[in-house]
Amino acid sequence: MVMLDILSNALIQIKNAEVMGKRQVTIWPVNKLTYYTLRVLQRYGYVGEIEYVDDGRGGKYIVQLLGKINDIGPIRPRYPVKYREIVQWEQKFLPARQIGILVISTSQGVVSHIEAKEKKIGGVLLAYVY
């Protein structure tokens, strides 16, 4: 099986585990972008503890699920977004105001759309979660 997008694969694994009611999920393969995205989800209370396990083949993450995710997914293609346009993308991907987050890769790291608006920076849309 050819893995084209590691981040998309990780988000789909989380979504499937949430639907099945599991308490933890093992994400493999991983990269730094996946880790930073998981950290944003952890900061906003969508996932619990994130543990890295070095298995000699690139490693994997064991993520504790809290049952708070209704929907999660990658945004493909990865649209570039200016900070003034973030509200329009919120309306497109999130169900209502103040519900859920967009994950954005910026020049200052991977952040949520809330942090990007506060810092007045744009970036590339990676994922949505609510």
From Swiss-Prot:
MF (Gene Ontology): rRNA binding; structural constituent of ribosome
PROSITE patterns in the record: RIBOSOMAL_S8
Gene3D superfamilies per the UniProt record, alphabetical: 3.30.1370.30, 3.30.1490.10
Primary role: One of the primary rRNA binding proteins, it binds directly to 16S rRNA central domain where it helps coordinate assembly of the platform of the 30S subunit.
Pfam families assigned to the protein according to its UniProt record, in alphabetical order: Ribosomal_S8
Organism listed in the record: Pyrobaculum arsenaticum (strain DSM 13514 / JCM 11321 / PZ6)
Protein's UniProt name: Small ribosomal subunit protein uS8
Keywords per UniProt: Ribonucleoprotein, Ribosomal protein, RNA-binding, rRNA-binding
